[in-house]
């Protein structure tokens, strides 16, 4: 879980656009961010297993 101070700091619009970093919308994690879904890989995996992300299914072959 990300620090609350970092999440609050990130929610404000930065003075310069380059300073903005992507964070997971669920847990606030800055690493392993998936831009298409707006969340980190861990939250993506949990929601995909539960079937809460439309169009995403577990691969089997």
From Swiss-Prot:
Assembly information from the UniProt record: Part of the 30S ribosomal subunit. Contacts proteins S3 and S10.
Cofactor(s), by name: Zn(2+)
SUPFAM superfamilies xref list: Glucocorticoid receptor-like (DNA-binding domain)
Stored Pfam families: Ribosomal_S14 (PF00253)
InterPro entries: Ribosomal_uS14, Ribosomal_uS14_bact, Ribosomal_uS14_CS, Ribosomal_uS14_sf
Cited function: Binds 16S rRNA, required for the assembly of 30S particles and may also be responsible for determining the conformation of the 16S rRNA at the A site.
Cofactor binding note from Swiss-Prot or TrEMBL: Binds 1 zinc ion per subunit.
This protein's name: Small ribosomal subunit protein uS14
Family of this protein: Belongs to the universal ribosomal protein uS14 family. Zinc-binding uS14 subfamily.
Gene3D superfamilies in the record: 30s Ribosomal Protein S14, Chain N
Keyword terms of this UniProt record: Metal-binding, Ribonucleoprotein, Ribosomal protein, RNA-binding, rRNA-binding, Zinc
GO MF term list: rRNA binding; structural constituent of ribosome; zinc ion binding
Residue ranges the record marks as coiled coil: none
One GO BP: translation
GO CC annotation terms, alphabetical: cytoplasm; small ribosomal subunit
Protein residues bound to Zn(2+): 24, 27, 40, 43
Domain of life: Bacteria
């Amino acid at each position: 879980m990300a620090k609350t101070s970092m999440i609050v700091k990130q929610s404000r619009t930065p003075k310069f656009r380059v300073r903005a970093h992507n964070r997971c919308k669920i847990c606030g994690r800055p690493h392993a961010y998936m831009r298409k879904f707006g969340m980190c890989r861990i939250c993506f995996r949990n929601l995909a297993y539960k079937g809460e992300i439309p169009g995403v299914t577990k691969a089997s072959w």
